[in-house]
Amino acid sequence: MLTKCASSSDPFMDWCKPSRSRNKRFDSVIKAFGFIQTFGEACIYKKVSGSSVAFLILYVDDILLIGNDIEFLDSIKGYLNKNFSTKDFGEAAYIVGIKIYRDRSRRLIGLSQRTYLDKVLKKFKMDQAKKGFLPVLQGVKLSQTQCPTTAEGREKMKVIPYASAICSIMYAILCTRPDVYLSISLVGRYQSNPRVDHWTAVKNILKYLKRTKDMFLVYGGDKELVVNGYVDASF
């Protein structure tokens, strides 16, 4: 885990430049060393040399280096130190709100967002709520017919942070909690005109996340990748 502080040539002037200019400079410097920007994600770069592979992930001024060859990674860090003033924090343990756990004996990496979920629960005043067993309660049916049809009903819902709660949960889904993807997709349909019933469903998802906030996403372990697909007939 590295943090990029400034240009070694002229730190003050370099960091007075707009963020876009700094990003363009970093992009050109890292590509000159053989890194290729990935097509799907502009902040991820890849470099391959023989059997050695390295990924560089840039988030604002923080850099996460991943690779299968320590000497290869050291050469990359040396190159970065020549072009930028950097600080090496060692093995990555926490980045963008995600806690990283390792079990090297079993070749496992776990990603947890407990701290982030605690903040979300507190933000929406659900930190003292009861824990939910499932993200979607059995028998609950949501539909457009439940949406407010009067100005009074819509005005009442304006004080409810409906869309904000959904966006907060979506970040967890994208990073470590795909298990609530279906439930959030159901309540997300009513963001333009939600009713109390829809908000109750959102709070139920938060209750479930409160009960399961210690769960984390685990990668690795099995040598063979087995993919299971599921179809939701109601979609």
Task: Describe each region flagged by the PLM.
Residues 1-235:
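Long, low-complexity, charge-biased intrinsically disordered regions
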